Amino acid sequence: MKFTTGNDNRNGSVSAKASKAEPREDYYNIDPSKLYVKIKRTLSQRDGAGAGQIEVTLETSSEFVGFQKENYECTGLTFTSKGTIKLPQDAQAMATGVVQESIWMGVRIAQAGKVHLTASVLSDMDIAEVRLQGPAFDKRVYDDFDDTLDITTPGEYILKGAYQLAVRTPNASLGGRPISVEIQATLTPVS
């Protein structure tokens, strides 16, 4: 079984702001002329100086595996994303860091069958999820998942991954260490 491609909405952004300066930002968004192509990007921004510097990074990769433009079919979906905020060394520094990721990759499944979903969420906070949503079920993953799922109802299924990591300092509860979130998922048909 192969998948027919459907929805493709992939985007992410980073923002770093120290003291009263304007934030430094970067973002990506899937270009409509490049739907279903593999994306591999690193976005990184920093603001402030010396011990007051804050740094934000988004490393993202997503792919409609084996995508064939002639018939809009693919053999699977996969993505991985890691967001990190490195806090200022000065615990009293005023800074804001934001890393955001939203991945929606859809496929049309024409007949009942089975798919295999492998997914993981590693997060310092409850801010991230991986989700497979469609007519037969809505499977949410908040930690690790590796199992075969029954597609009893044909239709469009969307593999989603999303998080928003936002930090404002000074904040003594953060402990000064970098804060990160990582999500990954792979969806494949089962023969």
Regions from the PLM with identified roles:
Residues 2-39, 43-67, 71-72, 160-191:
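C-terminal edge strands of extracellular/lumenal beta-sandwich accessory domains
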Residues 55-97:
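Terminal (often C-terminal
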Residues 87-108, 146-147:
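Short beta-strands within extracellular/lumenal beta-sheet-rich domains
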Residues 108-116, 154:
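Extended extracellular/luminal ectodomain segments enriched in beta-structured repeat modules
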Residues 110-113, 121-127:
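Short proline/glycine-enriched turn/loop motifs at strand-loop junctions of beta-rich domains
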Residues 115-121, 157-167:
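Extracellular beta-strand-rich recognition modules
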Residues 124-137:
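Short, surface-exposed beta-strand/strand-loop-strand elements in extracellular ectodomains
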Residues 135-149:
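Short, solvent-exposed S/T- and G/P-enriched segments that are highly enriched in secreted/extracellular
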